[in-house]
């Protein structure tokens, strides 16, 4: 199998083939080698940030007429020039190897915010992660097509059971039945609980990514989802607390089950009147029921001991009761309210205190900056495994794999190890 597209080869116009892939970073390939890309994708990327061809040429550092020549197909950029264009256009290099401009990239109506946050212009980081989610999905579909395979569809439930408690029960059973990892129980860490649910969703056919390097603040976005009948995408925020990511993950899965885009935030309004607020409250309730089934919650010794002492909960007792479910004390307390085991007034009075203590504990327990682990988390461990497995089996060559993963060829093996099922996300 050839390792790299060679000068003079014809430009692809159909699906992305293994020999079309070019490396992303310096892996020993001369930077002057032409990058065989689709001109219309170059034009789309430039126009998406409102640059003229001349302005783009100057930012990229080429003659004023060069970008126009690329977009007309008269000339092609070199690898080095394409890397620079990717930086200028704020796009992943992999997007330039799509066969056509992606559609509908900049119309996200689904993202989840902290209480008190207000809608406003997206940050550059949110734009980039949203676009990256679309690109990675397209590339994953290319890999399935190359192997003449269909993405899993186990995440879907049709028809939807009613009421929502039945839907949550069916969803939990469906995901865990096919999950490659068991639930860790009360002795498991927050990372292990998150890892289990991420792996379950990926196995069922949902791509799970993270906002790159935590560059999007949680005050702007906690998570968002892209609904598709085939291979939908959930993006959580890598800067969020581990248990917060877990709840956001299942909240977005609830949106996918309901075939909705969301308008997500973290707040459940008891008196919600607008359709969007009711939808958010409903998705929160479904997520809580998936993670914390009623029977299992009520069977907890800490819960049974307080049937007649509803206001006797302390932070430590809540933490002990919440541990088997991998959720925060605040989320568990809210679940007790929904199940009629704690008064709403007690929850309101303690919520801010418990959130502050939980966030302080999470901050102290955050791990170091392992690049491979963080990159596998951001790209999505399932996506990394999909690409690295295709490379290992020679379905794609090394440079295509490097492009899809945005790494050096020499880094693919260690990144694949970081994406192993049992490694933390």
Predicted feature locations:
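Active-site hotspot residues in diverse enzymes, especially metal/ion-binding acidic/histidine motifs
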Residues: 2-425
């Amino acid at each position: 199998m050839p390792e790299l597209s060679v000068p003079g080869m014809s430009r692809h116009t159909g699906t992305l083939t293994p020999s079309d892939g070019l490396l992303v970073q310096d892996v020993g390939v001369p930077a002057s080698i032409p990058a065989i890309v689709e001109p219309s994708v170059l034009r789309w990327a430039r126009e998406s940030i409102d640059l003229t061809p001349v302005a783009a040429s100057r930012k990229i550092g080429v003659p004023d007429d060069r970008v126009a020549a690329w977009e007309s197909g008269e000339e092609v950029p070199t690898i080095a020039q394409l890397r620079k264009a990717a930086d200028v256009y704020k796009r992943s290099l992999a997007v330039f190897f799509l066969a056509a401009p992606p559609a509908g990239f900049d119309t996200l109506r689904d993202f989840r915010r902290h209480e008190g946050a207000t809608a406003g212009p997206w940050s550059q980081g949110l734009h980039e992660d949203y676009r990256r989610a679309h690109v990675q999905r397209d590339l994953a579909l290319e890999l399935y097509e190359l192997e003449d395979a269909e993405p899993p569809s186990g995440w879907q439930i049709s028809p939807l059971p009613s009421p929502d408690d039945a839907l949550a029960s069916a969803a939990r059973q469906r995901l865990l039945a096919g999950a490659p990892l068991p639930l860790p129980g009360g002795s498991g860490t927050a990372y292990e609980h998150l890892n289990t649910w991420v792996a379950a969703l990926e196995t069922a056919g949902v791509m799970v990514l993270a906002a790159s390097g935590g560059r999007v603040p949680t005050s702007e976005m906690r998570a968002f989802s892209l609904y598709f009948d085939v291979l939908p995408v959930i993006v959580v925020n890598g800067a969020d607390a581990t248990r917060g990511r877990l709840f956001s993950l299942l909240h977005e899965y609830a949106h996918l089950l309901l075939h909705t885009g969301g308008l997500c935030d973290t707040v459940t309004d008891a008196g919600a009147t607008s359709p969007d607020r009711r939808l958010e409250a409903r998705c929160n309730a479904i997520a809580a029921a998936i993670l914390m089934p009623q029977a299992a919650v009520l069977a907890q010794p800490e819960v049974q001991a307080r049937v007649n002492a509803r206001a006797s909960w302390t932070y430590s007792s809540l933490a002990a009761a919440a541990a088997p479910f991998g959720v925060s004390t605040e989320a568990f307390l809210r679940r007790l309210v929904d199940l009629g085991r704690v008064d709403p007034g007690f929850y309101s009075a303690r919520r801010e205190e418990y959130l502050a203590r939980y966030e302080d504990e999470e901050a102290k327990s955050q791990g170091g900056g392992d690049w491979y682990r963080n990159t596998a988390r951001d790209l999505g461990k399932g996506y990394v495994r999909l690409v690295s497995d295709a490379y290992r089996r020679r379905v794609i060559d090394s440079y295509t794999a490097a492009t899809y993963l945005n790494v050096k060829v020499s880094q693919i093996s260690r990144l694949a190890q970081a994406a192993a099922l049992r490694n933390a996300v």
